[in-house]
Design a protein with these regions (language model features):
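Hydrophobic alpha-helical hairpins/lids featuring a short glycine-rich hinge
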Residues: 8, 13, 31, 35-38, ...
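C-terminal-of-GTPase-core extension/linker across diverse P-loop GTPases
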Residues: 39, 43-223
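Short, well-structured alpha-helical patches and their helix-loop capping segments
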Residues: 17, 25-29, 33, 49, ...
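Conserved P-loop NTPase nucleotide-binding/switch module
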Residues: 2-30
Length: 223
């Protein structure tokens, strides 16, 4: 999650342009990833001479190293999806899904779309972006539910940033939710987007997946 500053505060040093902040964050993460790859790549090249199964991993590291050395985060690069998958065990910071939160102040809430727009344009389809006044959200979180709702409504914040953040993070990670319900409880379950009914059943219990017969589709209001 990139938390990008847009709020004005003379007591807090640093840029207040979220686009500039984005570039600083990306540069720092890219340099950290470059250091990680350079610490591994020569060792893997030597090992691949004795173990041919490492050839694909070395190829992937070379592709990623080229992008990082050029100052390009992996998620912005043209590195193939297969190569990005191969290097996952290295836990590179710029090879992860990205969610950008532009931290605005109270005075910017009425024009938050305008403040967020340059970051949305820069990231395009690469990452979801939304604005939030983190200071207000933190203050609201300390209140009881009724007072919190009143405060958020007073500032026109609706449900607040947290539910939007959770939904955006779920989508960025390729996660979805299904529900089970019965007389004793209703429960939410997390599954990977694109999973089929048997795989979702397996999330509840592996026996359900092994013994899966069929799924019936009915309208929600018939439940």
């Amino acid at each position: 999650v990139y938390v990008l500053r847009a709020f004005e505060d003379a007591d807090v040093p640093g840029p207040t342009d979220p686009l500039e902040h984005l570039r600083i964050v990306e540069l720092e993460l890219t340099l950290a990833d470059l250091e990680t790859v350079e610490a591994q790549i020569e060792r893997k090249r030597k090992q691949s001479k004795l173990d041919k199964s490492l050839a694909e991993e070395v190829k992937a590291l070379d592709a990623v190293h080229e992008a990082l050395a050029d100052g390009t985060p992996v998620y912005r690069s043209g590195v193939k999806a297969a190569d990005r998958e191969t290097i996952k065990p290295y836990f590179l910071l710029t090879n992860k899904p990205v969610l950008a939160v532009v931290n605005v102040d109270e005075d910017q809430l009425e024009r938050v779309d305008e403040v967020v727009a340059p970051v949305e344009k820069e990231l395009g389809e690469l990452a979801p972006v939304f604005g939030a006044c983190v200071q207000l959200e933190a203050e609201a979180a300390l209140l009881d539910p009724e007072e919190r709702t009143e405060m958020l409504d007073a500032f026109g914040l609706g449900e607040g940033a947290l539910p939007r953040f959770v939904r955006a993070a779920y989508n960025a990670l390729g996660l979805r939710t299904f529900f089970t319900t019965g007389e004793k409880e209703s429960r939410a379950w997390t599954f990977r987007a694109g999973a089929k009914a048997p795989e979702c059943a397996g999330v509840i219990h592996t026996d359900f997946q092994r013994g899966f017969i069929r799924a019936e589709v009915i309208h929600w209001d018939e439940l």
